[in-house]
Amino acid sequence: MKQVFESENISYVGVTEELIPDYLVMVNDIEHVDRFIGGWHEPYTAEDEARWVREQLESNAVVFSMIEKKSGSFIGNVELMDVSDTVKEIGIAITAAKQGLGYGKEAVTAMAAYGMDTLGLDRIVLRTNTDNFRAIHVYEKCGFREFRRTEDHVYMEKVR
């Protein structure tokens, strides 16, 4: 796995078929999966994840797998999804075993910096469920501010 960039405790590598077993554990975790994959119905298969990896690589998506530096273990994925040329939406998914250890804050901060400094973005947006108070707090600590709220979602942004 080739490292693209790093932060204090995390190496950010391109998505790879090598991590499919780790991806499957994360996306098929019924207790935690609905927070980052809306409308989850059926368990994902290795073929589903292989297709996803291929699609990400073929489209040059800005998505990275996060690897814990000290152990080499998989933490989760973080991505910047297209909104426009200068605005992207950040998304993050962390395995249940690595939640609550500060990796979310570190990864969102690092990915926002990568987006603005390396990709030249002017604005990064995100959305989360209105009842995901822990995530909202983390995003605020990363410099994101709420700009819109609906019954189901909080929309936040970080502007250069």
Give the residues covered by each predicted segment.
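Acetyl-CoA-dependent GNAT
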Residues: 39-91, 95-97, 150
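Amphipathic alpha-helical recognition patches that constitute DNA-binding helices
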Residues: 22, 89, 93, 134
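Conserved acetyl-CoA-binding loop-helix of GNAT-fold acetyltransferases
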Residues: 94, 100-114, 136-141
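Hydrophobic adenine-recognition pocket in adenosine-nucleotide-binding enzymes
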Residues: 15, 94, 128
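A short, well-structured alpha-helix characteristic of acyl/acetyltransferase catalytic modules
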Residues: 1-46, 50
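Conserved G/P- and acidic residue-centered "switch" motifs that form tight phosphate/ATP-binding loops
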Residues: 72, 102, 132
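C-terminal "cap" of GNAT-fold acetyltransferases
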Residues: 122-133, 141-160
